[in-house]
């Protein structure tokens, strides 16, 4: 993580030199990270669409093999192979983004910004007005609504945004800006 942290810190300073604002630098850094991860995000979208298209067939298999779970699992795996679908394909971009998130968290927690951004007095401290945590919850909810392939995840679509909003209360404002901008793109 040290190399990634150093690279993100360098990029943050580079974008600050371009913009003159660490808030804008974080937004530009977020867009750069999203651009770097775009091929994985596209792959995730395709995988989710393929899984969504297979839902009717999977439900039919579930009804047909409801008393034979082993046979059901075998048939589902055959269905995945037949349609060249990887059920874990949607997870990869999220897993790849985690090191970026952790490294950025470390950078923003230790970074001395010297100035604030908009209403924020420090990008290293939590948002005292809770505007960013609310935005993080709202944008997480919108993103989940746009990308969810499974109706059975409805409870998660409400729990996850509330959880993200809650934990964002204590995160550095710069990290929450990253999360919000990342959700929007």
What is each residue range found by the language model?
Residues 1-185:
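Helix-loop-helix
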